[in-house]
Amino acid sequence: MKPTAPRIRGRLGLVGLACALGCAPGPYQRADAMRAEPIEPLGEDRISLHWKFVTADRRTEVEPQEFAQAAVTADTVFVGSASGMFYALRAATGAVRWRKRVGAVASAPIPAGGLLYIGTADGALVVLDAQTGVEKWRYQSRGPIQQSPVVTTDLVVFSNEADQVVAVDGITGKFKWQYKGETPEEYTLRGHAGVAVDGELIYTGFSNGILVALRKDTGSVAWSTSLRADAERFMDVDATPIVIGDRVYASSSSGGVYALDKATGLVRWRLPFWDAALPGATGNVGGLASDGKALYVSAADLGTYALDLEGNVLWRVGARGGGEPAQPVIWNELLLYSLAESGLFIADRRTGQTLEYFDPGDGISARPVVAGSQLYVMSNRGILYAFDLE
């Protein structure tokens, strides 16, 4: 059993692709180059604990997982958890402002216009007053909502694990339209893609390996493109697409990462993920992030990659034995990412070199969140950690 006490450590035994091609021997190379495995020596101190808050008592559970993420506005931190309780906390101390039972949460709430838009595991979009926690309205969909909704000037758009995209009025919650993707009869991977809104189009993907662009006003299909490659199962598009310039970047567990023309869906390039040492790896992408110049991709079993916008690999660090990845986060020169069975990694985003590592004892499945110079991350035991980030 893993220890329950958190550990903060420095550089890990993770070697990037550049080192695999030849670099000076160092003590960090004593470990398996592709394993998520910390070893000495310690590296740089980039985080210090500010406070922590227990959202749920999960000490007696075997291998629990928490996917909820925080959202921060001014001096308040908002967060839910699998326990069903939702909290507003003082950012300075972690003290409770108010709490409300809304149902299990596996994503970040979206603050907008004095309201909080929250997706729940029972398929409800719940809207609360951000100051008081009073419920304004809720809309019930037919599948668990595991990605944050997107709030526009007049609509709230969200997706769920039933391969649905739903748009409702942002003020009243009145139904506007719904699009249903085809769900395969075979088993699919856990999770689903969120929605990316760009102008008048909404981009998302489904468990059948299809990426679609929907018209925002009607939900009708502008185009659809298969990202399945040659796979017959486990072809899920579970990472939320990213729009940069005239391209949309997306991924599937069977096809790797794609760049497509955002207006037509035409594939510009594709980078498949595969490792000869791991022929059974799903390669399911936990998330995409970009600084506008590079893409950062976390793929199950295979590691975290940095790509340029033409699909060339800049570096790679391994994740074998680390568990499922969450979406990476960019902060200044750093890249932050978490692995479900290992913890939180803080790396130099230019090289992939890990600078610091935080292991709460039970791994981290949730995406980290950065607000200003504060880092917030939820452990699998339901503890929200607030760090000062340097």
Range-by-range predicted roles:
Residues 20-22:
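C-terminal motif of bacterial Sec signal peptides marking the signal peptidase cleavage site
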Residues 26-35, 42-71, 96-112, 135-152, ...:
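Extracytoplasmic beta-rich repeat domains
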Residues 81, 120, 160-161, 206, ...:
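Structural signature of WD-repeat beta-propellers
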Residues 90-93, 129-132, 169-172, 215-219, ...:
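Short loop/turn segments that connect beta-strands within beta-propeller blades
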Residues 294-305, 309, 316-346:
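Loop/turn-rich, solvent-exposed surfaces of beta-rich toroidal or solenoidal domains
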Residues 360-390:
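Blade-level signature of beta-propeller repeat domains, shared across WD40, Kelch, NHL, RCC1
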